């Protein structure tokens, strides 16, 4: 592929991305773009970011060869990028630290965030505590119920959690409320968006703070295996963990990039969250991308066993990678993800997040079709502590 260089100056990834927001936000987005460009050019900012990643987050995260699982599947060797071992238990903190440092640099003492599974909310509350900032997290009331433990974590960390009762009471509604708050309190508030979506410069900025995942893999894989993997696999909701591991590999030839979407109860049922598999281009939350919408352009309600994948859109860069044919996107059902969750627990002693379990499930399908000398690298984007209640409930166990 010729050198990949996106987004353009206006935040477009081909026909996707851009800035579709109320005029009242243009100023704030321009201010953010300028502050980010200045921070990128400042070696002190980079040095502080790297220091925080090493000493606060615990990076680099290791890569683990899932030998027993690979043997059991009888095909390709599966390696796991262990983002679940980061402080706060997922990849989200990589981005939150970067944005909190930007907020501090811009003199904004208050940060807000939206969250689905609660992981981004916890990561935001964590960095707000670390930097002494006021923190408000918006969360769909449906997700507040599903993720009670994470809600309590956020409160312990000093954040105010606001349950959102509108719409489907999930991530997209939390995002709408967070946007409203930001418009009202632009003078003192920084909006820490948790995924590679939203208006420019967010998709670029979040990707840049997450690309540390793939950059580490580029160094670690040859050390472990003597070469780069044949395929990199990651789950895709909004898509920040996937973009973080994909981006450094885009110009590396011979490496397949496979994003795994939530097929929920099955693609044929309509109860899923697979916007790249079944969606059409449209505009939501400030950018143009693939969306799950009806004939009238109304967003349809999504479903996934995993709160973090339960979103009707996807980051615009994923939309562009799909159209370019550089990445492929595959759907995995709730039941397939749950099966992979249980298998990894028993075979490797690792409890994965339900989001990550979708990527694991696709790896389990793909590995047996490949030769034993092929290598699959799966981004294990988070740990499964937060999902204990959901998984137990599915198994008929009540705490």
UniProtKB/Swiss-Prot annotation:
Q: Which reaction does it catalyse?
A: (1S,2R)-1-C-(indol-3-yl)glycerol 3-phosphate + L-serine = D-glyceraldehyde 3-phosphate + L-tryptophan + H2O
- One Pfam family per UniProt: PALP
- Report which superkingdom the organism of origin falls in: Bacteria
Keyword set, alphabetical order: Amino-acid biosynthesis, Aromatic amino acid biosynthesis, Lyase, Pyridoxal phosphate, Tryptophan biosynthesis
Q: Which cofactor does it need?
A: pyridoxal 5'-phosphate
Q: In which pathway does it act?
A: Amino-acid biosynthesis; L-tryptophan biosynthesis; L-tryptophan from chorismate: step 5/5
Q: Which GO terms describe its cellular component?
A: cytoplasm
Q: Which PROSITE patterns match?
A: TRP_SYNTHASE_BETA
**GO MF terms held by the record:** tryptophan synthase activity
The signal peptide here is none
Spell out the InterPro entries in the cross-references.
Trp_synth_b_CS, Trp_synth_beta, Trp_synth_beta/beta-like, TrpB-like_PALP, TrpB-like_PALP_sf
Family matches, as CDD domains:
Trp-synth_B
Identify which top EC class this enzyme belongs to. lyase
State the HAMAP family in the record: Trp_synth_beta
Assembly and interactions? Tetramer of two alpha and two beta chains.
What's the family?
Belongs to the TrpB family.
Q: What does this protein do?
A: The beta subunit is responsible for the synthesis of L-tryptophan from indole and L-serine.
What's the name of the protein? Tryptophan synthase beta chain
Source organism per UniProt: Dechloromonas aromatica (strain RCB)
Write the gene name: trpB
